[in-house]
Regions:
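Short hydrophobic segments within beta-strands
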Residues: 34, 52-53, 131
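Short beta-alpha junctions and helix-cap segments that line functional grooves
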Residues: 4, 62-68, 139-141
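Non-catalytic accessory segments flanking enzyme active sites
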Residues: 1-42, 67-70, 74-75, 116-119, ...
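Short, conserved glycine- and acidic-residue-centered signature motifs
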Residues: 14, 65, 103-106
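Active-site-proximal cap/loop segments of hydrolase catalytic domains
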Residues: 81-171
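Proline-rich low-complexity regions
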Residues: 14-16, 36, 48, 57, ...
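Alpha/beta-hydrolase fold active-site loops
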Residues: 29, 48, 127
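Short substrate-entry loop that stabilizes the transition state in hydrolases
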Residues: 39-91, 162
Length: 171
């Protein structure tokens, strides 16, 4: 429907730009970059960056609308989101690569995306944050205990203990 048409006509939304990033072991990681609305390639100001990690882990990101990504971009952040190993949509090998091994292949891919962000001309490499919910929160927790490259971190409804998750989960 076009229920929100009048509202959307008043807003300038960020459009995700598709990227492919090569992980250290040669795996290609599908990613998207959303710059603040109105920012052009001629803009010299470097913005804070936010690396978003999806839940699941067997979920996936794409070019669909994410309210929280638009809010962050509108606030002046460059938002980067990707589908590291463990994500759906790239075949069985990609999806099952982290089975019983969270924090290995997926972590390699997350680090590759972070390295991409540190080199991106629109992103201030000293102001990169990481965030995610559920499994994305787990990987955010993993990241901040395995590197100091992130200036900030937000975990939302995160998995912090796999044993307690098994005993208290709705699944």
């Amino acid at each position: 429907t076009h229920f929100n048409g009048p509202l959307l006509e008043q807003l300038e939304l960020s459009k995700p730009a598709e990227k492919w990033i090569t992980s250290d072991d040669g795996t290609r990681v599908h990613a998207w970059v959303m710059q603040p609305p109105g920012r052009t390639s001629r803009s010299r100001r470097r913005c804070p960056g936010v690396l978003q990690i999806h839940g699941g882990p067997h979920a996936l990101y794409g070019t669909t609308f994410f309210h929280e990504f638009q809010v962050l971009a509108a606030a002046g952040h460059v938002v980067v989101f990707s589908n590291p190993r463990g994500s759906k949509g790239y075949g069985e090998e990609h999806c099952t690569a982290i089975q019983g091994q969270w924090g290995v292949a997926d972590w390699t891919d997350v680090q590759a995306v972070a390295s991409f962000m540190e080199q991106h001309p629109a992103i201030d490499p000293h102001r990169i944050g990481i965030m995610g919910g559920s499994y994305g929160g787990y990987m955010t927790n993993w990241a901040i205990t395995h590197t100091d490259r992130f200036a900030a971190a937000i975990t939302d409804r995160c998995v912090a203990n796999l044993v307690s998750m098994a005993g208290s989960s709705d699944y």
